[in-house]
Amino acid sequence: MYYRTRTYIAGDWDHDKDAVEALHRWNESSKYGLSFSDAHELKQAKDTSLNCSIKRSLAERLDASKTFILIVGDHTKELKAGGCQYCGSYNSYRGTCSRGHTIDTRSYIDFECEKAIRDGLKIIVLYKSTFVNRDKCPEVIRWKGIHVPMEKWIGNTLYLDYDSVRNAIGQ
């Protein structure tokens, strides 16, 4: 059992990793006032080959979190990774797991969002864009929490908007 003191960051790690890394840079820098304890610093899944093992590990991290941040980019809504149907242990003919685990066809993102809502975490949705486009957000969390863009134009240059992110997180 953990105390709920951490911040859980979810997103498309293949396409939006730069936004996640920006949050970590702002958190680690003495120049910025962002301050959070990352839930992903807790233990990792022992068997990362099984989606159910990874989801168990994600659930433990969410159990230690008070804030859930979802970074929404161009591909977030379409992510499918994490569903049992993509695991080698899934028997599509029978719709069962050959290892005896419960079947969960949700993606990692949908799993994380649903658990954050169910657990009553503070929800912050950061759009890797200059505007909020809820159509890009997973449906389960589309109308929950605080939604803000995390980019802004200054002149002809696109920047990450630290102030917008900090205000959303409430620090």
What kind of region is each of these model predictions?
Residues 1-67, 170-171:
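Conserved N-terminal substructure of TIR/SEFIR domains
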Residues 4-6, 127-171:
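C-terminal interaction surface of TIR/SEFIR-family domains
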Residues 11, 72, 125-127:
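Short beta-strand/turn micro-motifs composed of small residues
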Residues 15, 76, 131:
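Surface-exposed, flexible loop/turn segments at secondary-structure boundaries
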Residues 21-22, 83, 135-139:
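Short aromatic-enriched loop/helix-cap "lid" or pocket-rim segments at secondary-structure transitions
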Residues 30-57, 74-89, 94-103:
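Conserved BB-loop
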Residues 68-69, 123:
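Short, well-ordered beta-strand core segments
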Residues 79-134:
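Amphipathic helical hotspot of TIR/SEFIR-family domains
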